[in-house]
UniProtKB/Swiss-Prot annotation:
Residues 138-218 form the Ig-like V-type domain. Keywords: Immunoglobulin domain, Membrane, Signal, Transmembrane, Transmembrane helix. This is Butyrophilin-like protein 3. Disulfide bonds: none annotated. GO terms for cellular component: external side of plasma membrane. Residues 18-237 are extracellular. It comes from Homo sapiens (Human). Expressed in small intestine, colon, testis, spleen, and leukocyte. It comes from the Eukaryota. CDD domains: IgV_MOG_like, SPRY_PRY_C-I_1. Residues 270-463 form the B30.2/SPRY domain. One of its GO terms (molecular function) is signaling receptor binding. SMART domains: IG, IGv, PRY, SPRY.
């Protein structure tokens, strides 16, 4: 019976030349920063080696990837997909192919399809790509006393699409609260939710729920009876009594502690300074020459003497180049795929800058992309609020400190680390560990903020040994 069925199908194929295209299903689910795989096949099995195979988005002419005449036609792709697709054709003789779409972002959401065309017949299948991002664990903080109660604030970042945030009481009941969600420049949502509770409220939960992934994360805080609500009169009387009784003891204690701890604290500071200096001295042994590539610079960035980048108010007229960034970025002419390398960048009093390395094959035509290791970036940023942050691979906020005017960057390719130094006080800002470097890496600078009054050039500077 099976043999007869095979003969019938073979005869049908030879006579009609028709077949059906089967896609990956009604929808494909993918997480931001990861890859999505679209698998398509022909039924009955038919070789697609001599066919045109087109993956498209929303409409037929919006090409995600094109296979024709036995070759991949990258020139036909939409710019946002160049360098991000991998056409897998190991089983194309049996009519089975796959397309891997790399580094998924929220902007990739939409309707996709695969289309097979022979000389006498064509057919397609479509599906929906759904994208999600799982954000950080909720962070609960106690703001203080408000309107006779205790105000709690819960924060979580990096979600897509917008999640549901709510407070829950000790029995799991939903509590009335105020919430806000704001999308950042990468379409990821930051959630903020607040509530006012009474003393002895017990266990209070902050819950963030993403329905699309059936994913929920919670954090808990226990509100007991020990919270002390300050009354001005009661607080004043208590402070007066304590002040009179303890003033002498405090003064004497401070004197004793001062002399005991002065030497210890100074010794610890000296050790930290020497330790940081030792790391920096070792890094500077691997100093390399770095020059900027003008062909990669955004039109608003002017590169001079191959070392200096200045943010202009108006874009320059520059020749078209596939190497040029659509973000206000520039990379070096030099690239590294082995060894240890150190260079220094003078950022002056600027804010909103990024300094670090990126893979040579990152999508330079895409503006809204998270500069994280998942997307081929290992960078440090200083925001307008003088707050450092980086990704490894998720968002890391670093403790505020005096912003440097010069940043040292130390790349250890085989060691899988990149360190950032404040060369002003010779301290280590942060080290990204367990980095999985692949391919060629280039020194990277993003000069994101334009300030006509305070803005100054950013430049690669000679390594200082002081």
């Amino acid at each position: 019976m099976a043999f007869v069925l095979i003969l019938v199908l073979s005869f049908y194929e030879l006579v009609s030349g028709q077949w059906q295209v089967t896609g990956p299903g009604k929808f494909v689910q993918a997480l931001v920063g990861e890859d999505a795989v679209f698998s398509c096949s022909l039924f009955p099995e038919t070789s697609a080696e001599a066919m045109e195979v087109r993956f498209f988005r929303n409409q037929f002419h919006a090409v995600v990837h094109l296979y024709r005449d036995g070759e991949d036609w990258e020139s036909k792709q939409m710019p946002q997909y160049r360098g991000r697709t991998e056409f897998v054709k190991d089983s194309i003789a049996g009519g089975r192919v796959s397309l891997r779409l790399k580094n998924i972002t929220p902007s990739d959401i939409g309707l996709y399809g695969c289309w097979f065309s022979s000389q006498i017949y064509d057919e397609e299948a479509t599906w929906e790509l759904r994208v999600a991002a799982l954000g950080s664990l909720p962070l609960i903080s106690i703001v203080g006393y408000v309107d006779g109660g205790i105000q709690l604030l819960c924060l979580s970042s990096g979600w897509f699409p917008q999640p549901t945030a709510k407070w829950k009481g000790p029995q799991g009941q939903d509590l009335s609260s105020d919430s806000r969600a704001n999308a950042d420049g990468y379409s990821l949502y930051d959630v903020e939710i607040s509530i006012i509770v009474q003393e002895n409220a017990g266990s209070i939960l902050c819950s963030i729920h993403l329905a699309e992934q059936s994913h929920e994360v919670e954090s808990k805080v226990l509100i007991g009876e020990t919270f002390f609500q300050p009354s001005p009169w009661r607080l004043a009387s208590i402070l007066l009594g304590l002040l009179c009784g303890a003033l002498c003891g405090v003064v004497m204690g401070m004197i004793i502690v001062f002399f005991k701890s002065k030497g210890k604290i100074q010794a610890e500071l000296d050790w930290r300074r020497k330790h940081g200096q030792a790391e920096l001295r070792d890094a500077r042994k691997h100093a390399v020459e770095v020059t900027l590539d003008p062909e990669t610079a955004h039109p608003k960035l002017c590169v001079s003497d191959l070392k200096t980048v200045t943010h202009r108010k108006a874009p320059q007229e520059v020749p078209h180049s596939e190497k040029r960034f659509t973000r206000k970025s520039v990379v070096a002419s030099q690239g590294f795929q082995a060894g240890k390398h150190y260079w220094e960048v003078d950022v002056g009093q600027n804010v909103g800058w990024y300094v670090g390395v990126c893979r040579d094959d990152v999508d330079r035509g895409k503006n809204n992309v998270t500069l994280s290791p998942n997307n081929g970036y290992w960078v440090l940023r200083l925001t307008t609020e003088h707050l450092y942050f980086t990704f490894n691979p998720h968002f890391i906020s670093l403790p505020p400190s005096t912003p440097p005017t010069r940043v040292g960057v130390f790349l250890d390719y085989e060691g899988g680390t990149i360190s950032f130094f404040n060369t002003n006080d010779q301290s280590l800002i942060y080290t990204l560990l367990t980095c999985q470097f692949e391919g060629l890496l280039r020194p990277y600078i993003q000069h994101a903020m334009y300030d006509e009054e305070k803005g100054t050039p950013i430049f690669i500077c000679p390594v200082s040994w002081g």
